[in-house]
Amino acid sequence: MKFPGKRKSKHYFPVNARDPLLQQFQPENETSAAWVVGIDQTLVDIEAKVDDEFIERYGLSAGHSLVIEDDVAEALYQELKQKNLITHQFAGGTIGNTMHNYSVLADDRSVLLGVMCSNIEIGSYAYRYLCNTSSRTDLNYLQGVDGPIGRCFTLIGESGERTFAISPGHMNQLRAESIPEDVIAGASALVLTSYLVRCKPGEPMPEATMKAIEYAKKYNVPVVLTLGTKFVIAENPQWWQQFLKDHVSILAMNEDEAEALTGESDPLLASDKALDWVDLVLCTAGPIGLYMAGFTEDEAKRKTQHPLLPGAIAEFNQYEFSRAMRHKDCQNPLRVYSHIAPYMGGPEKIMNTNGAGDGALAALLHDITANSYHRSNVPNSSKHKFTWLTYSSLAQVCKYANRVSYQVLNQHSPRLTRGLPEREDSLEESYWDR
């Protein structure tokens, strides 16, 4: 487990030098592992350059997103392959991206649950999915299906306009019996997306998702929900509010989804409102930066050394140096908030907005899992006087999430190819020392 964020001292966590005082508390075997588990609609993003006639011939609407049938998708895919029009085939899916990015950042195990083609041809989209996923992401629990996984075609027309064609394939065929109880029982978090409970009638995915939530509750594993798009939420915000209240501990969203859910256009007020239902909120707000909101134990609150920020809640970041806790673990819960502007003002040229939020969530998951890992290895540490949810303060998690988002915005793919550099030039040292 690599530890999140930067720390000034070189060894802030006793891993290599075994402290004799720790020996008595630690088993002789390998230090206990920590991991996260996520359920996804297994999806491959296929990008191709086509002419306008191609888009018309398949009955697609230029510049829009349409769901297409499996046979149309197969014909379309075969034609793209024969004519060599495919420019990129990436593993996609919100949770797949998040698990991959978590494994790259933490250099540790994540587990992905979902479906995968039983027969995989070399060079096919399913093969690409496996190739583009970190080797630290455990794919051993995927359920085999007889047919295609999900495919999202991005067809770039002559004018550069993007048209999307989505073929769900068998991606929603995950059955409840394919959810491994022991894997969820030992996890630091269960990560889900709102798309999982919104499927066609008769598809087993929602039932599998609820089964996973049931296991998570049984073993006190925090459930993390990332909101899909504002349209899914806007259909029935009250239903989602109740769903969050009943099942979810950590919520990740962008400012549009936040407004659809809460009716508040200010991301800070929306995050505050969401604390009525969940324990911790991560809200990315594009060029404004990102917000976090959570609870801490009043007795253990820590004042910020950063300038106090104005906002809809005055001086809202006053206690941003506090670590987050779940509401039920607090004796006297206090709401705490933090905000950070985009790292280095954001990239000069944004290559890709798809996945910046998944990157930020992966950073938060890394911090939460590092906390579980530290607690199981150094249980009597003063860092665990209270039952904290995060290893670092809200302000520090914001910095880390922000840095990872920047990395994703700066590249073509939503998946990181390597972890963050140990030391950086540029503004780095002054940035982390702030």
UniProtKB/Swiss-Prot annotation:
Binding site for GMP: D40, Q41, T42, L43, V44, D45, G93, T94, I95, G96, N97, R198
pH-related activity note: Optimum pH is 8.2 for guanosine kinase activity. Optimum pH is 6.9 for inosine kinase activity.
Keyword tRNA-binding: no
Cofactors (names): Mg(2+)
Any single biological process term in GO: purine ribonucleoside salvage
Cofactor binding description: Mg(2+) is probably required for activity in addition to its role in forming the Mg-ATP complex.
Function: Catalyzes the phosphorylation of guanosine and inosine to GMP and IMP, respectively. Can also use deoxyguanosine and xanthosine, but not adenosine, uridine, cytidine or deoxythymidine. Shows a strong preference for guanosine. dATP can serve as a phosphate donor as well as ATP. Shows weaker activity with UTP and CTP.
Protein name, as recorded: Guanosine-inosine kinase
Species of provenance: Escherichia coli (strain K12)
Organism lineage: Bacteria, Pseudomonadati, Pseudomonadota, Gammaproteobacteria, Enterobacterales
Gene coding for it: gsk
